Amino acid sequence: MPNVLSAQQIEHFHSQGFLEAIPVLSQGEVEHYRGCLESFERMYPNDVKKLKSKSHILCPWVADIARNENILDVYEDLIGPNILCYSMAFRIKDPDGKTFAGWHQDGAANPIKPILVIGALALADCSLAHGCLKVIPGSHKKGVLQHTDTGNPDSILSRGQFISTEFDESKAVNLELKAGEIGLFNAGIIHSSPVNTSDERRLVLLVEMIPTHT
């Protein structure tokens, strides 16, 4: 029996490649973890970039998020009870109207089989103005498309990569989140995120999980 997701939600994730906002953290938890992040930034300003990959190894409080029962229940409904944390990666956008992610597939860099499920966990409200994720429904079934590296320093992606094959962007869905909500997607889905045009930071933690039989 599913823990928290309905049969319709589970079917939607596997057929469309994503799920929209699911509440997993209380307001108190959000404030606590946001405080932990801000404390780290103050104490180790030169190490903030290390939070962009496998931050659960560096910070015990990030590992606590990875073990959160509400979050794990969601993943269990999608990939079963035997779960391995692949990575916890912060994707922070300052309100400078510069940082973005072009259209890409995470599966191009991490071709994990049978599945890598990525959750965008919001530690602050994340609307389109903040630069929320945009996904192309069902595109995880297309296979990995051709990507081109640009090295653009304004890209939130490691190589400034983007999909150089044509696809229909008009089908994009915005994954807007309230603080404490998580939106999930298959690593193979085509997705992007625009610049942050708000006056607040976008604070998103990517929660990347795989089944242990991967």
Task: Locate each region found by the language model.
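Short, solvent-exposed loop/turn segments at secondary-structure junctions
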Residues: 26-27, 91-93, 108, 126-128, ...
